[in-house]
Amino acid sequence: MIEIRNLSQRFEGPRGWIEALHNVNLTIPQGEVFGIIGRSGAGKSTLVRTINLLTRPSEGSVFVGGRDLTQLSAAELRGARRDIGMIFQHFNLLSSRTVFDNVALPLELAGVKRAQIEATVLPLLDLVGLAAQKDRYPAQISGGQKQRVGIARALASKPKVLLSDEATSALDPETTRAILDLLRRINRELGLTIVLITHQMEVIKDVCDRVAVLDAGRVVEEGNVIDVFMRPHHEVTRALIGDVIAQELPPAMKARVAERLKTGSGHLLRLAFTGSGVDQPILSETIRRYELDFNILHGQIDEIQGRAFGSLAVLATGEPGKVGQAFAYLREQGVVVEELSYVE
């Protein structure tokens, strides 16, 4: 388990001190894939580098496996870091070494015997799908394969935690998907805790169990990925989700809806469904029960952690009393009802 307590990080800049992280508190259970997302400059990379103390925090504690890394001696910290692997956006492979030898490098530096190195590296190359490329050099393999080498190298010391700092941001969408599938498989098969830093909500949606949203060095939202998508509270979260699932009407549609609302009454709603709710005729039943009119303005269906997720923007009109009853009924069916505006 990883526990970050009251963590702050300050750097001295040309115009004074800069607070990169402010009073961050996070708990990441063993075996979880935990995402940390935010825009550029939010403090994501600074935060992930405090987990293995590549960056020592100005204040606070970092517990990994029950040990406070900030209180360890230099020798103890080197030992603790063997339990924490890390992969980066840039692959950092040695061009003069083969795929096998790049993965073997940390074991060689640790003084592991050659026979044990082979017994460790070959299964790792098989795990990441590079057994046939073990004798090739970095210049002879693709970007996605280079990242797989980086993953295998990070796993060579048999860590309990894997930190991923924007590991897919330089890859094309298809390769990104393959790397994320690999990380999820490693998580399942090895029981590895993965902390994944990204600015892409698509990555969070596809692979993470829980997510923390970082803005200006502060955690502004945290929760299960499906819950955060269903009920985003902070404006930064809404904006990030909007990169994947549209949360707002297109401008031209907004203008038409505004004109229409001026002539009558209505409720502009965002409805979010998940799981079996996507397959059920809930809107049809609501219309029949409460004699409402639903005009669907915008809709999208996606998948989060293997579960169907749907989002609709609708204009609802009807008798005021029945409208309130209809909203209550929808919520009873597990639908998230968010009123975007009301015009009378």
UniProtKB/Swiss-Prot annotation:
Quaternary structure and interacting proteins, as annotated: The complex is composed of two ATP-binding proteins (MetN), two transmembrane proteins (MetI) and a solute-binding protein (MetQ).
Phylogenetic lineage: Bacteria, Pseudomonadati, Pseudomonadota, Betaproteobacteria, Burkholderiales
Species for this entry: Burkholderia mallei (strain ATCC 23344)
Topology in membrane: Peripheral membrane protein
Protein name as catalogued: Methionine import ATP-binding protein MetN 1
Listed SMART domains: AAA (SM00382), NIL (SM00930)
Top EC group: translocase
InterPro entries the UniProt entry points to: AAA+_ATPase, ABC_transporter-like_ATP-bd, ABC_transporter-like_CS, ACT-like_dom_sf, MetN_ABC, MetN_ABC_transporter-like, NIL_domain, P-loop_NTPase
Domain of life: Bacteria
Catalyzed reactions per annotation: L-methionine(out) + ATP + H2O = L-methionine(in) + ADP + phosphate + H(+); D-methionine(out) + ATP + H2O = D-methionine(in) + ADP + phosphate + H(+)
